[in-house]
Swiss-Prot record:
Keywords: Cell outer membrane, Membrane, Periplasm, Secreted, Signal, Toxin, Transmembrane, Transmembrane beta strand, Virulence. It comes from Helicobacter pylori (Campylobacter pylori). The keyword Transmembrane applies. The signal peptide, cleaved at the inner membrane, guides the autotransporter protein to the periplasmic space. Then, insertion of the C-terminal translocator domain in the outer membrane forms a hydrophilic pore for the translocation of the passenger domain to the bacterial cell surface, with subsequent cleavage. Residues 1018-1291 form the Autotransporter domain. This is Vacuolating cytotoxin autotransporter. It comes from the Bacteria.
Length: 1291
């Protein structure tokens, strides 16, 4: 029977809404649809399996899909099974191409005309209830199957695992089912080496127009040992009830794969269900283009492998795609069922009842199963399972397609998976929107979601929707685990009525822009941990979010939103922060806008820039804190009113708040100025009053501006010269105002001293010149003072005011009021300095360079200070401001400066300067010095400098490596002593010795013994493996250092042309150090490795050794003193060393070589080094730099005594002197802010060393050894001790 061999595609009728009413009765099989939605998809996601194992291939996939295929009916059993076996001729030509249908299939496939559908179709010989099995397992070559269209059953099984199958060379193929009362399922299975799809492939399509007989269900299985591929024009279509199983090393489908495709008019009235199973694909599955839905609510499932890639995913407006990733470890095979319960086994039994005819085709009659009771597999229902940690679903672009159908609530398309990672690429997402609205849900039940591309509406970034027809993007990460992260790496721009909803544990956004007209909703209320947004632009936007970090919030009005606000409609919690808030300028009051908050515990804002016709309403937030700046943002913009509303407001340390009539700031609760500065802008001769609804607190410190010498002000009036004179200007009013000095730890409402201190922090400026106090050092200062107070005479004739030089002058024309309810200034006009008019204080002279200074700090004897006041702001002392000496002098402790230098030296002074001034300020230094005596200061500084010098020392940093190297030197010497034996007492192989002496003459007995020694154990068992436990300690007064670890190696005695010992070793040791004050603690992991050898020439011994070492040190500083607490930190670095050694010795042997005395001399080279420190401290005194390197050259002289007894035992002692004769190196000074510690080292060291050890035989070829070594530095008087205990095995 011929099949069509021409290129063609089946024409699909367009869906016509006019025909809906006439075709409502034409719907897919209802029982199948219901079972798929209520059992199969939930079963796969929920983990349904059979037998004992959940998540098994044979259970979850095999049984679950089998039930989907058969749709709640009894299993299909063929009436007949036809078998075809390919002859040997098909096994001979691997490069030959065959027509599969003509060559093998045609004899057992019938065809005919389907009058109901007006199309031709094909079936297994004698009817769709039969089966055809084709055995081609040894066939080779390429087999083309083209034009087998409308194959309606029964089952077809083709095994051609050594050949290539090419589907659709000239025409496509379609495999479908024949619906009758039995609702049979067609199963088609191709098993090949490679499968190539060149043309369209349809699964479970209706025959012809589809107007007649419906299809039941079809399962197509393509299995290839190497790969499955399709061309770009090869479209694969899965209709309702279709299942496609793919099993291979890799799958790459370049053509469109269409799941849930329609064929007949009106089919969109009911959903369709289709499945692709790729769980048996070991590599990546690649869909170039995947389409789900064809004007219908298609539901599709992909049972995925570990990695699934989809180039473009097209979803119909109501379609859903479920991608089910395998669990950790993959799907596991379930135990075999009993043979009587499997259809496969029934087929096997059928074969036993078959007979064979002469045409090599078997006709098999099925057994009579009428008396058998069929037992269905057990259904085990478990909860959802997560995809394995390496499971990934990559989709470059997602599109949704829509038509003009209107439905209340709109339509929603969905993508759901359980993979560990769902990644949407740079193609982004496009949502096609129509009337009544459209939505897209992207959900990862147990993992993360990452989106790299933009979000589009109707193919436009920033595309908009219409009121009542909103476009909605919805993302859910970790729905079941509550631990997923949703990350958006591209800027998101949303037009009007476009909404975004994200549910996750953590959500990260690069940028979100809803300022293109507004009326958007950003619903992040389902984020349980933190929402992080780099930049958020809003306009009339509803933002539902709690606990967020927003780097920049820009609030627009756009001149279109009348009274519309950006509304944070959820309680924002206690951990929300905005780095920068920018309110953009509105056009006029009718088009004003702003932002308001429903509620929250606390909001922290770093920078806040407000603008006219834009409002900020945070009255429902309990506390708002400004940490850097609150300022009028736009420059050159039209003046207008901004309205800022708070409940409780805090101005943080060093923060600045600009305030004017246009600020319109409302604080209905409390206001705290915690060492910030309020800048008042004078307009129209007045300043705006900051009104506080309840209480205000003014907290200040003793910190001084190093540039001017003045205290850092809490309030500044800029352009104060423009103030209306003889008028009280109220700066702040509250029910209660309190004052506090955080440096002194005091606060009060009515404390006079605190109020006077506060007044010194209320400053008036004319441009950059302070008006209330002038400091005069020279004529330039006289001019600046004249400019500040408006005295033109001082500007033009400064020489007339030279009597002010060296003085600080106070302008008594300015009075300040601070009490429990009001802070104000009264500007009477500037006073004029006179030569004897008072109100001046002399500036001190620096005795070193005779120059007067304008630095300011605290003293009590200012002539214009109140008697009961605490120290006021006046000129100070003989030392430069900003030095530790100036602080001592301010505290009337000038003598302690000499004590500091005498007991701690310049290094101690510099360290104190760094700790108190350079890392903090003069106020902090004064507080610390006032609390500490001079003796205690020098004691603590000496402790710190000793510790820091120790830290910088390369000897300290490499001490662990040196102790480990010393331990190994002892072990290696013991090994060389052992293998240098020339003495033995007992001869085990005496016959061998006698045979060697046959016909020999000797001048002495010793000469004969030399022959016997050739059969000593070191010759018979020349190779040794050894391991030792090692321990060591350093003996010095500076602290406790110890090391413990293990060393192992292998060596051998070589007795060829050159008599030698060669060996290698590796070791590990953990070293620790703690100084006596317990302020420095270290722990290091050290490794040492190297090679060693000895060459013999009669009684001459030449030793060579090379080794390297590396240590990773983790240390911490733990000072208990408050003065030194900033030094406390943890830090780490790497230490390393390399060494080579060569020596020569001569053996003097006694008692037949039992006793050997060996003097020796040698030279060695050591390279020691360390890397820079890496500190975890965020203090200014964090340790930095510190890398150092040293090259050492040494000469040594040693004497060694060895005593050998028995065949294997020995004892030795070695003593010697090691003298450095040259060293050089480099060092990068350890730095702590401005303080530096340079490493110091003794010029040339001399060491004395003694070591001893021995070995005993425990059992045949097993030995125990023990050793000790002591090394003493005769220059630094530091000793090092090490010991070892180990085992040796010879072979």
């Amino acid at each position: 029977m011929e099949i069509q061999q021409t290129h063609r595609k089946i024409n699909r009728p367009l869906v016509s809404l006019a025909l809906v009413g006439a075709l409502v009765s034409i719907t897919p099989q209802q029982s199948h649809a219901a079972f798929f939605t209520t059992v199969i998809i939930p079963a796969i996601v929920g983990g349904i399996a059979t037998g004992a194992a959940v998540g098994t291939v044979s259970g979850l996939l095999g049984w679950g899909l089998k039930q989907a295929e058969e749709a709640n009916k009894t299993p299909d059993k063929p009436d007949k099974v036809w078998r075809i076996q390919a002859g040997k001729g098909f096994n001979e030509f691997p490069n030959k191409e065959y027509d599969l249908y003509k060559s093998l299939l045609s004899s057992k496939i019938d065809g005919g005309w389907d009058w109901g559908n007006a199309a031709r179709h094909y079936w297994v010989k004698d009817g769709q209830w039969n089966k055809l099995e084709v055995d081609m397992q040894n066939a080779v070559g390429t087999y083309n199957l083209s034009g087998l269209i409308n194959f309606t059953g029964g089952d077809l099984d083709v095994n051609m695992q050594k050949a290539t199958l090419r589907l659709g060379q000239f025409n496509g193929n379609s495999f479908t089912s024949y619906k009758d009362s039995a609702d049979r399922t067609t199963r088609v299975d191709f098993n090949a080496k490679n499968i190539l799809i060149d043309n369209f492939l349809e699964i479970n399509n209706r025959v012809g127009s589809g107007a007649g007989r419906k299809a039941s269900s079809t399962v197509l299985t393509l299995q290839a040992s190497e790969g499955i591929t399709s061309r770009e024009n090869a479209e694969i279509s899965l209709y309702d009830g279709a299942t496609l199983n793919l099993a291979s090393n890799s799958v790459k489908l370049m053509g469109n794969v269409w799941m849930g495709r329609l064929q007949y008019v009106g089919a969109y009235l009911a959903p369709s269900y289709s499945t692709i199973n790729t769980s048996k694909v070991t590599g990546e599955v690649n869909f170039n283009h995947l389409t789900v839905g064809d004007h219908n609510a298609a539901q599709a499932g992909i049972i995925a492998s570990n990695k699934t890639h989809i180039g473009t995913l097209d979803l119909w407006q109501s379609a859903g795609l479920n991608i089910i990733a395998p669990p950790e470890g993959g799907y596991k095979d379930k135990p075999n069922d009993k043979p009587s319960n499997t259809t496969q086994n029934n087929a096997k039994n059928d074969k036993q009842e078959s007979s064979q005819n002469n045409s090599n085709t078997q006709v098999i009659n099925p057994p009579n199963s009428a008396q058998k009771t069929e037992i269905q597999p057990t259904q085990v229902i478990d909860g959802p399972f997560a995809g394995g940690k390496n499971t990934v679903v990559n989709i470059n672009r997602i599109n949704t397609n829509a038509d003009g159908t209107i439905r209340v609530g709109g339509f929603k398309a969905s993508l759901t998976t359980n993979a560990a990672h769902l990644h949407i690429g740079k193609g982004g997402i496009n949502l096609s929107n129509q009337a009544s609205g459209r939505s897209l849900l992207v959900e990862n039940l147990t993992g993360n979601i990452t989106v790299d591309g933009p979000l589009r509406v109707n193919n436009q970034v920033g595309g908009y929707a219409l009121a009542g027809s909103s476009a909605n993007f919805e993302f859910k990460a970790g729905t079941d685990t509550k631990n997923g992260t949703a990350t958006f790496n591209n800027d998101i721009s949303l037009g009007r009525f476009v909404n975004l909803k994200v549910d996750a544990h953590t959500a990260n956004f690069k940028g979100i822009d809803t300022g293109n007209g507004g009326f958007n909703t950003l619903d992040f209320s389902g984020v349980t941990n933190k929402v992080n947004i780099n930049k958020l632009i809003t306009a009339s936007t509803n933002v539902a979010v709690k606990n967020f970090n927003i780097n920049e919030l820009v609030v627009k009005t756009n001149g279109v939103s009348v009274g519309e606000y950006t509304h944070f409609s959820e309680d924002i919690g206690s951990q929300s922060r905005i780095n920068t808030v920018r309110l953009e300028t509105g056009t006029r009051s009718i088009y004003s806008g702003g932002v308001k908050f429903k509620g929250g515990e606390k909001l922290v804002i770093n920078d806040f820039y407000y603008a006219p016709w834009n409002y900020f309403d945070a009255r429902n937030i309990k506390n708002v804190e400004i940490t850097n700046k609150l300022a009028f943002g736009p420059q050159g913009s039209p003046w207008g009113t901004a309205k800022l509303m708070f409940n409780n407001l805090t101005l943080g340390q060093n923060a600045v708040m600009d305030y004017s009539q246009f600020s319109n700031l409302t604080i209905q609760g409390d206001f705290v100025n915690n060492q910030g500065t309020i800048n008042y802008l004078v307009r129209g001769g007045q300043v705006a009053t900051l009104n506080v609804g309840n209480a205000a607190a003014m907290f200040f410190s003793n910190n001084v501006d190093s540039a001017t010498g003045f205290y850092q002000p809490l309030m500044k009036i800029n352009s104060a010269q423009d103030l209306i004179k003889n008028k009280e200007h109220v700066l702040l009013k509250a029910k209660i105002i309190g004052y506090g000095n955080v440096s002194a730890g005091t606060d009060s409402i009515a404390n006079v001293n605190l109020i006077e201190q506060f007044k010194e922090r209320l400053a008036l400026y004319n441009n950059n010149n302070r008006m209330d106090i002038c400091v005069v050092r020279n004529t330039d200062d006289i001019k600046a003072c004249g400019t500040a107070i408006g005295n033109q005479s001082m500007v033009n004739n400064p020489e007339n005011y030279k009597y002010l030089e060296g003085k600080a002058w106070k302008n008594i024309g300015i009075s300040k009021t601070a009490n429990g309810s009001k802070i104000s200034v009264h500007y009477l006009g500037n006073s004029t300095p006179t030569e004897n008019g008072g109100n001046t204080t002399n500036l001190p002279t620096n005795t070193t360079n005779k120059v007067r200074f304008a630095s300011y700090a605290l003293i009590k004897n200012a002539p214009f200070a109140r008697y009961s006041a605490t120290p006021n702001l006046v000129a100070i002392n003989q030392h430069d401001f900003g030095t530790i000496e100036s602080v001592f002098e301010l505290a009337n402790r000038s003598n302690d400066i000499d004590t500091l230098y005498a007991n701690s030296g310049a290094q101690g002074r510099d360290l104190l300067q760094t700790l108190l001034i350079d890392s903090h300020d003069a106020g902090y230094a004064r507080t610390m010095i006032d609390a500490t005596s001079a003796n205690e200061i020098t004691k603590q500084l000496n402790t710190a400098t000793t510790t820091l010098n120790n830290i910088a020392s390369l000897e300290h940093k490499t001490s662990g490596l040196q102790t480990l190297s010393l331990s190994n030197a002892m072990i290696l010497n013991s090994r060389l002593v052992n293998l240098s034996r020339r003495h033995t007492n007992h001869i085990d192989s005496f016959a061998k010795r006698l045979q060697a002496l046959k016909d020999q003459r000797f001048a002495s007995l010793e000469s004969a013994a030399e022959v016997l020694y050739q059969f000593a154990p070191k010759y018979e068992k020349p190779t040794n493996v050894w391991a030792n436990a090692i321990g060591g300690t350093s003996l010095n007064s500076g602290g406790n250092a110890s090391l413990y670890g293990t060393s192992a190696g292998v060596d051998a005695y070589l007795n060829g042309e050159v008599e030698a010992i060669v060996g290698g070793f590796g070791s590990y040791g953990y070293s620790s150090f703690s100084n006596q004050a317990n302020s420095l603690n270290s722990g290091a992991n050290n490794t040492n490795f190297g090679v060693y050898s000895r060459i013999f020439a009669n009684q001459h011994e030449f030793d060579f050794e090379a080794q390297g070492a590396l240590g990773s040190d983790q240390s911490s500083l733990n000072f208990k003193s408050a003065l030194l607490r900033d030094l406390n930190q943890s830090y780490n670095y790497l230490a390393y060393s390399a060494a080579t050694r060569a020596s020569y010795g001569y053996d003097f042997a006694f008692f037949r070589n039992a006793l050997v005395l060996k003097p020796s001399v040698g030279v060695s080279y050591n390279h020691l080094g360390s890397t820079n420190f890496k500190s975890n401290s965020n203090q200014k005194v964090a340790l930095k730099n510190g890398a150092s390197s040293q090259h050492l050259f040494n000469a040594s002289a040693n004497v060694e005594a060895r005593y050998y007894y028995g065949d294997t035992s020995y004892f030795y002692m070695n003593a010697g002197v090691l003298q450095e004769f040259a060293n050089f190196g480099s060092s990068n000074a350890v730095s702590l802010n401005t303080f530096k510690v340079n490493a110091t080292r003794n010029p040339l060291n001399t060491h004395a060393r003694v070591m001893m050890g021995g070995e005993l035989k425990l059992a045949k070829e097993v030995f125990l050894n023990l050793g000790f070594v002591y090394l003493h530095n005769l220059i630094s008087n530091i000793g090092h001790f090490a010991s070892n205990l180990g085992m040796r095995y010879s072979f």
